[in-house]
């Protein structure tokens, strides 16, 4: 390997370098004054030489958002060449490459190039090579290829986006890696660099690169280039790969917000517009870097056995005494036996009593765990006591599967209190005898206070005796009567000091382990010799030391257990919100989960957001998390989430296994592609047209075609643009109304029905789901979330009405004799005995669009058809009261769904939701309020309108919103009444998973 010469410093021989496998690069000290003089000598010749080198050499340009890191060390070859030859110093300083931030290398990393270095060392010592005189470093042979590739890419893509200019050099990552490898080898005494000199070099290269970039991309072309490169770099200031930019990174893409995902819709297919063309982002990949050549660490699957070994090593570092203990603390694999989900620390604490702890569900009454300080008092239980009317469980079956779980008297201690307890020293040492006059409560640690705090509900009496005096009293009496001297024997003194070193000076052991200590500073008592007669004290001290070590291990495992449980609670919350769990019962689900896992948690739900607070009673603190997501409906994933939720609640699987299953479920793709969903969208529109809106046989294919257009707008266009998703409902209703009125006007409305085509095509974007959730939340006393959803649903309905009015008016301007019928003729309708055949087909379409499995469809069809029969006959008697018919149909649906959940142990939500969606179009069609704006369209196209008619039309334009509210109120009343009949006392263990 080549050795470098310095100013007065001796270098090692090549044989020594080969033996030690590294080179000691000795860097000279750069003279700042000499550097300035060299710059002041610049003449016209040197300026011409500078310009020529700039044109010949390839300048390294960084993007505007990326600045090279300021390194303390300069390039070894550059600085050595500047001191060895004065003739090449001017060229080196003038060369822009020399101003780049320099790097240092570890010889072990470039060991493969040692042969080339040996060959080039002779030449460089004689005359010096071109590369060394210019101060450039050859990283590897692939750099030349990458430079040629960069030049070719810059020529080909210079006019388009210019993404190659924003990519870092491939060798820069290697340099950064090698720079970090040699940080520990640098000695500032051997050779250094002036920091101001290095700072000036960095500033000069950044300014020169920016000026050169500005000259090259000036004018309109440069402006568009800046727009296209806006926010194109990653979180670290540069892109991770050399691929072409996606649509979301270009100027047009940012205007239309391609790939942003859009917001969730409010129709019968919530979340359909949340699909994106891009892959779902991986947070770990974004943090660690997803490029192949970015030098980031590849994220791999978690190996829990390996983590267990690492945790043991970490404990051994912090607590060295734990290495000599009995290795009885083994990791509990995920495929453990049933009943070990909540007591995951039990095998680590006491393996013999693990089975006993699993058999008893009420872990809070276990006094052994309370002694270890793992539990803290449940403040809610202390405040309200046992007189909570909501927790009366006298009429519930505790022995059954859904047995009642009372609010725990104690919950797991928080993370902060456990950390403080882990790093606090015990206060019951002999050093406390010097301050025996102090009150015992003043010397308590947080661990001792927490142990007393576990018995707060029982108000245990306290004593004012000073037990520290009792400890020293008997010893003084023995010494007094036996007249023994305090002089230790020579052979026993060293042994006694070694035995009691940790006990007499507890801070010294913590200093050895480099642990922080939160103990109050107090004077230490002088060392006392141990009486040889008192042999039993040694045994007690050993046992006490072992007990403290076991307590530290328990606390360490307890902290990881608490973090795992809190993470699972947030994951299950996000999954339930994503896949369409009943929003008015989300707080109940989370409360039940935290109660079973013995976590002190409080939950507040807002639309699209859940605020989670984990309390710590010992430190009077709380940790607040906000879980946000775009809510939608995915019936298959909702069923899987419910299965995982029930398995954890009933102690069938552990928390870590449930977390792994949830992660796998979230990453799983949807069952049906967007193109299939568009086809199902059109098929569903065709099926709902005859039985809900009175369409004929000829209206079915027309409605199918128009429904395909609406489905494409929702699943493709709306999912690619955030801006368009805001006006999707208006544009879809305009297109549908325009096409439907044009087709309905053929042959003077004798062939096709305008109202059936228009309402059938818009049936799947009716605000049925969101207004249903709003009414259920209002009825369950969740005023904030219910009011927000209800008001949004009303405005959403007005959007649809405005779009229908505008589309009909546009066609009225084109064709003066357009139809204005809001109802189909009686002779045009399908016979009533055939309408029931379209209901199961529409139910299948609704289930498949919402990603339901095929095995879930039979139950959906039975419940949906039964509910429609009730609605049909109720509509014959209450023709003008849509809320009555909706309430009767929803009551039937709720009874069947809850019975299915209770008898066959299914999930009522997935079985009831398509049946409820069938009730919404039927209620809307009873008054034809969706086409109430057709009169306003006629008013716009005909100028002879009076003030009376305009006032009546203003009231009719709001009729669609009022009809939606009436239908939703009837549905919510029917659902709550059905839940009351089937579950008169509710489900106190898992929560009622129904609408």
Swiss-Prot record:
Pfam families: ThrE, ThrE_2. Residues 326-347 have a biased composition (Polar residues). Residues 259-269 have a biased composition (Gly residues). Residues 110-121, 170-187, 359-371, 385-396 have a biased composition (Basic and acidic residues). Residues 283-296, 495-506 have a biased composition (Acidic residues). The chain crosses the membrane at residues 678-698, 700-720, 726-746, 752-772, 794-814, 833-850, 858-878, 881-901, 906-926, 965-985. It comes from the Eukaryota. Belongs to the ThrE exporter (TC 2.A.79) family. This is Pheromone-regulated membrane protein 10. It comes from Pichia sorbitophila (strain ATCC MYA-4447 / BCRC 22081 / CBS 7064 / NBRC 10061 / NRRL Y-12695) (Hybrid yeast).
């Amino acid at each position: 390997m080549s050795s470098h010469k310095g100013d007065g410093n001796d270098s090692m021989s090549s044989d020594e370098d080969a033996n030690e496998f590294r080179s000691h690069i000795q860097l000279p000290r750069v003279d700042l004054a000499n550097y300035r003089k060299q710059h002041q000598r610049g003449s016209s010749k040197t300026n011409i030489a500078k310009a020529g080198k700039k044109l010949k050499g390839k300048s390294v340009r960084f993007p505007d958002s990326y600045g090279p890191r300021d390194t303390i060390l300069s390039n070894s070859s550059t600085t050595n060449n500047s001191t060895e030859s004065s003739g090449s110093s001017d060229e080196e300083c003038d060369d822009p490459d020399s101003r780049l931030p320099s790097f240092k290398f570890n010889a072990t990393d470039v060991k493969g190039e040692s042969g080339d270095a040996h060959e080039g060392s002779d030449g460089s010592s004689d005359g010096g090579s071109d590369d060394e005189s210019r101060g450039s470093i050859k990283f590897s042979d692939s750099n030349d290829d990458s430079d040629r590739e960069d030049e070719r890419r810059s020529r080909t893509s210079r006019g388009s986006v210019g993404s190659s200019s924003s990519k870092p050099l491939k060798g820069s990552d290697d340099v950064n890696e090698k720079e970090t490898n040699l940080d520990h080898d640098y000695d500032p005494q051997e050779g250094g660099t002036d920091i101001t000199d290095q700072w000036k070099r960095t500033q000069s290269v950044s300014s020169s690169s920016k000026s050169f970039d500005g000259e090259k991309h000036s004018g309109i072309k440069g402006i568009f280039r800046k727009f296209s490169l806006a926010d194109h770099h990653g979180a670290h200031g540069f892109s991770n790969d050399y691929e072409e930019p996606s649509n979301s990174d270009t100027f047009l893409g940012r205007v239309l917000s391609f790939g942003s995902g859009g917001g969730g819709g409010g129709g019968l297919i919530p979340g359909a517009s949340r699909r994106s063309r891009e892959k779902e982002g991986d947070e770990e990949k974004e943090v660690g870097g997803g490029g192949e050549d970015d030098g980031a660490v590849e994220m791999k699957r978690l190996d829990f056995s390996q983590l267990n070994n690492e945790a043991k090593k970490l404990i051994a570092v912090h607590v060295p005494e734990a290495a000599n203990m009995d290795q009885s603390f083994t990791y509990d694999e995920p495929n453990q036996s049933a009943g070990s989900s909540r007591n995951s620390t039990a095998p680590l604490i006491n393996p013999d009593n693990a089975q006993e702890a699993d058999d008893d569900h009420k872990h809070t009454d276990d006094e052994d765990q309370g002694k270890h300080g793992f539990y803290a008092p449940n403040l809610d239980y202390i405040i309200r006591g046992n007189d909570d009317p909501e927790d009366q469980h006298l009429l519930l079956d505790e022995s059954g599967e859904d047995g009642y779980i009372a609010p725990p008297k104690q919950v797991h201690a928080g993370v902060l209190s456990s950390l403080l307890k882990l790093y606090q020293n015990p206060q019951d040492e002999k050093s406390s005898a010097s301050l025996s006059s102090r009150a015992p409560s003043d010397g308590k640690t947080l661990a001792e206070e927490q142990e007393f705090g576990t018995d707060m509900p029982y108000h245990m009496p306290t004593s004012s005796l000073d037990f520290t005096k009792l400890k020293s009293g008997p010893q003084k009496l023995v010494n007094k009567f036996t007249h023994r001297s305090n002089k230790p024997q020579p052979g026993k003194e060293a042994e006694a000091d070694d035995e009691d070193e940790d006990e007499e000076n507890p801070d010294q052991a913590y200093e050895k382990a480099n642990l922080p200590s939160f103990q109050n500073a107090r004077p230490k008592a002088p060392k006392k010799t141990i009486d040889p007669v008192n042999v039993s004290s040694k045994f007690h001290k050993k046992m006490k030391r072992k007990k403290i070590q076991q307590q530290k291990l328990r606390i360490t495992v307890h902290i990881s257990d608490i973090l795992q449980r809190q993470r699972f609670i947030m994951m299950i919350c996000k999954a339930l919100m994503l896949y369409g769990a009943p929003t008015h019962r989300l707080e109940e689900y989370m409360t039940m989960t935290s109660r079973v896992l013995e976590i002190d948690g409080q939950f507040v739900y807002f639309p699209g957001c859940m605020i989670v607070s984990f309390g710590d009673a010992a430190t009077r603190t709380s940790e607040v998390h906000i879980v946000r997501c775009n809510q939608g409906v995915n019936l298959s994933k909702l069923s899987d989430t419910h299965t995982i939720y029930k398995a954890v609640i009933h102690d069938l699987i552990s928390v870590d296994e449930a977390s792994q299953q949830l992660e796998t479920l979230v990453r799983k793709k949807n069952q049906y592609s967007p193109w299939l969903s568009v086809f199902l969208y059109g098929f569903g529109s065709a099926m709902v047209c005859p039985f809900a809106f009175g369409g004929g046989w000829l209206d079915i294919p027309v409605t199918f075609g128009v429904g395909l257009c609406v489905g494409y707008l929702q699943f493709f266009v709306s999912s690619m643009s955030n801006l368009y998703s805001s006006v999707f409902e208006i544009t879809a209703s305009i297109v549908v109304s325009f096409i439907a009125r044009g087709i309905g006007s053929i042959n003077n409305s004798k062939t096709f029905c305008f109202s059936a085509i228009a309402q059938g095509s818009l049936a799947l974007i009716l605000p049925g789901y969101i207004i249903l959730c709003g009414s259920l939340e209002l009825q369950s006393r969740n005023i904030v979330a219910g009011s927000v959803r209800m008001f949004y649903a009303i405005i959403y309905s007005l959007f649809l009405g405005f779009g229908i009015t505008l589309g009909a008016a546009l066609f009225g301007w084109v064709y003066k004799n357009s139809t204005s019928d809001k109802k189909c003729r009686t002779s045009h309708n399908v016979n009533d005995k055939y309408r029931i055949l379209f209901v199961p087909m529409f139910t299948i379409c609704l289930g498949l669009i919402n990603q339901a499995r095929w095995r879930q469809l039979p139950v959906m069809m039975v419940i949906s058809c039964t509910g429609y029969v009730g609605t049909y006959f109720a509509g014959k008697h209450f023709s003008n009261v849509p809320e009555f018919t909706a309430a009767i149909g929803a009551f039937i649906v709720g009874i069947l769904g809850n019975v299915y959940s209770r008898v066959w142990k299914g999930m009522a939500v997935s079985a009831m939701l398509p049946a409820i969606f069938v009730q919404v179009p039927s209620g809307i069609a009873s008054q034809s309020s969706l086409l109430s704006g057709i009169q306003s369209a006629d008013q716009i196209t005909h100028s002879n309108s009076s003030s009376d008619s305009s006032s009546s039309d203003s009231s009719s334009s709001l009729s669609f919103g009022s009809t939606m509210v009436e239908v939703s109120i009837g549905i919510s009343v029917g659902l709550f009444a059905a839940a009351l009949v089937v579950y008169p006392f509710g489900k106190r263990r898992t929560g009622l998973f129904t609408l």
